[in-house]
Regions:
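ATP-binding glycine-rich loop module of kinase domains
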Residues: 240-268, 292-293, 299-303
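Conserved core of the sugar-phosphate nucleotidyltransferase
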Residues: 110-188
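N-terminal nucleotide-binding beta1-loop-alpha1 segment
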Residues: 1-19
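Conserved alpha/beta core of the MobA/IspD/sugar-nucleotide pyrophosphorylase nucleotidyltransferase superfamily
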Residues: 3, 162-244, 249
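Helix-rich C-terminal or lid/interface subdomains of diverse kinases
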Residues: 222, 310-311, 345-359, 436-437, ...
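Active-site Asp-x-Gly
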Residues: 161, 409-465
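Conserved beta-loop-beta/alpha segment of the NTase-like Rossmann-fold superfamily
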Residues: 63-64, 68-139
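Conserved kinase catalytic-core helix
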Residues: 273-277, 299-368, 372-390, 394-395, ...
């Protein structure tokens, strides 16, 4: 008996969630959906996985996460456009499934599955869930006749007295299954056929189809259900997810995903310069980095000004921010402009277009007037004129230097995240950016953001924003101010301006999360107030 999972489809109902990767790779809690599926089956089961849309992501991930599993990958040559369909994707795997198997949709999560359906069987079965939702294909069954399926329905108006089809089928009569799928592929030309349509149209297994009703079901096939699943998931950690990146925890491994090709190569090149400050990397592929889980304490826990000062001095004394001289100054300045100015404008223009926001009138943020002349673009141009910007110092580290991405173990601080490059410069960055990111984290932390412990309200031209922060952590801002001014001769308002700039840059990265507007307006307010302080 085998397990068959199709991952070849484009996931069109999921919008931006599948813009950069496959729908089976959507993260719920600590894992992608496909891991929740595989982890419900016996470890010795043979698995067949069809690959299509971003199939290489799926293949790389499964080979890293399940090196001891017996997985056969099947390439689907046509997964989008004319002639593509779920049925065609299934048919591509026909030669590998000439025995009984379980078919499991890649957007169906069910807890405690082995206790609810058989892993070895001598009959065909279909799996359902009792719900009042009206989005699903369905069937009814006779509980007095060993749960025999009576009739199937294509998206009925009401599911009363029926069970919704969850996307799991046990195929015992596999020859009949493949015969009907091939027939459907030839005959159903008016639409893209899918598996349930075949069961319904041809009454497949009409006299030998049993129903199993599960007591839970998470459908991750649409945006609303993904959001709901993420809220309910107890097996999670606090991080703001991005649609083109992911961090998964599988056993004692941490697997980081980067959708864009080339990012991992750049990260690994940068890593050579900063490895002493980071944990050891176990392996990497084109789109993934793997390291063992580090059993340390989150740096943000119990943070206070005294511990914070110790942490800053630790990195200072270990030369994290020492100036590097092996770079052309003129080229560094060109990259600096692209990083701070051009990238910011590109991102906020996308954000403003998405939310139909203009900057052509005065606004009040937390009762502070921001005149219309102080657009983000105008403030960036003023920012460029300050001596601190002109005299930016390149250093080895360039990354997400925040407490949320830092561990403490045996008296040492371990950095978990670094950036691939500073614009086009791979191994170097601007230390003021690191200080600004730390400053950001003292106010804006993953815990409050992920638990939605923030507020934003908009009424006419008045916007109010706030986020819950730890008083002891907030108090560290004064420590940071003293540190940067004493050791690096840079003013705190300048650092604070870059913090605001970071927030407006973050806003379009989280447009599926209400935190995006908080970041935009909090960022603009911080930039404005910091600019006034710098000019005072």
């Amino acid at each position: 008996m085998k397990l068959f999972i199709t991952t070849s489809g484009i996931g069109s109902r999921l919008g931006d969630l599948t813009k950069f990767t496959n729908k089976s790779m959507i993260k719920i809690g600590k894992k992608p959906v496909i891991s929740y599926i595989i982890d419900e089956y016996p470890k010795d089961i043979e698995i067949v996985v069809s690959l299509g849309y971003y199939g290489d992501h799926v293949k790389q991930y499964l080979e890293l996460a399940y090196p001891d599993r017996n997985i056969t990958f099947v390439e689907v040559d046509n997964y989008a456009g004319p002639g593509s369909s779920q049925v065609y994707s299934q048919l591509c795997a026909e030669q590998y499934l000439q025995e009984p198997f379980i078919y499991h949709d890649c957007d169906t999560m069910i807890d405690n599955l082995q206790a609810q359906i058989p892993m070895n069987f001598d009959h065909n079965f279909i799996v359902g869930y009792e719900t009042n939702a009206e989005l699903y294909d369905a069937f009814d069954f006779d509980a007095t006749q060993n749960n025999k399926v009576i009739k199937t329905y294509m998206k009925p108006d009401s599911l009363e007295g029926m069970a919704a089809y969850v996307g799991i089928v046990g195929v015992y009569d596999y020859e009949t299954f493949w015969k009907n799928l091939n027939k459907a592929y030839r005959e159903i030309t008016y639409t893209a056929p899918h598996d349930f349509m075949v069961y319904h149209k041809y009454q497949m297994f009409a006299n030998n189809l049993r129903a199993y009703i599960v007591d839970n079901w998470t459908d991750t096939g649409n945006v609303a259900s993904v959001k709901e699943a993420r809220k309910k998931c107890k097996d999670s950690f606090q991080i703001l997810d991005k649609i083109d990146q992911g961090i998964f925890m599988i056993g004692n491994q941490v697997i980081k995903f980067f959708a864009k090709d080339g990012v991992v190569d750049n990260l690994m090149y940068h890593y050579k310069y900063i490895a002493d400050f980071c944990g050891p990397i176990k392996q990497h592929t084109k789109n993934f980095i793997v390291y063992d889980y580090i059993d340390g304490e989150d740096a943000i826990k119990g943070m206070n000004p005294e511990r914070f000062n110790k942490m800053l001095k630790y990195f200072h004394e270990n030369y994290l921010w020492n100036k590097v001289n092996c770079i052309d100054t003129e080229y560094f300045n060109v990259c600096k402009d692209r990083f701070y100015i051009d990238k910011t404008l590109d991102r906020i223009n996308h954000f403003k277009s998405y939310y139909n926001i203009t900057e052509d009138k005065d606004i009040y943020v937390n009762d502070v007037l921001i005149p219309k002349e102080y657009t983000i673009e105008n403030m960036l141009q003023e920012f460029r004129q300050f001596d601190e910007y002109k005299n930016t110092v390149p250093t080895n580290w360039h990354g997400d230097f925040v407490l949320d991405n830092m561990l403490v173990k045996d008296g040492e601080f371990i950095l978990l995240d670094w950036r691939e490059k500073f614009d086009d410069i791979i191994p170097f960055g601007d230390r003021n950016y690191d200080f600004a990111k730390m400053n950001h984290n003292l106010t804006f932390n993953f815990s409050s953001a992920c638990r939605e412990l923030f507020n934003i309200s908009e009424k006419d031209d008045h916007i109010y924003v706030s986020i819950l922060a730890d008083n002891y952590v907030l108090a560290c801002r004064e420590t940071l101010k003293d540190f940067v001014e004493t050791y690096y001769d840079v003013s705190y308002p300048y650092i604070n301006f870059i913090t605001g700039l970071c927030w407006v840059n973050m806003s379009p990265l989280h447009m599926l999360n209400p935190v995006c507007k908080l970041l935009f307006y909090m960022g603009k307010l911080t930039m404005y107030q910091s600019l006034l302080a710098m000019k005072a």
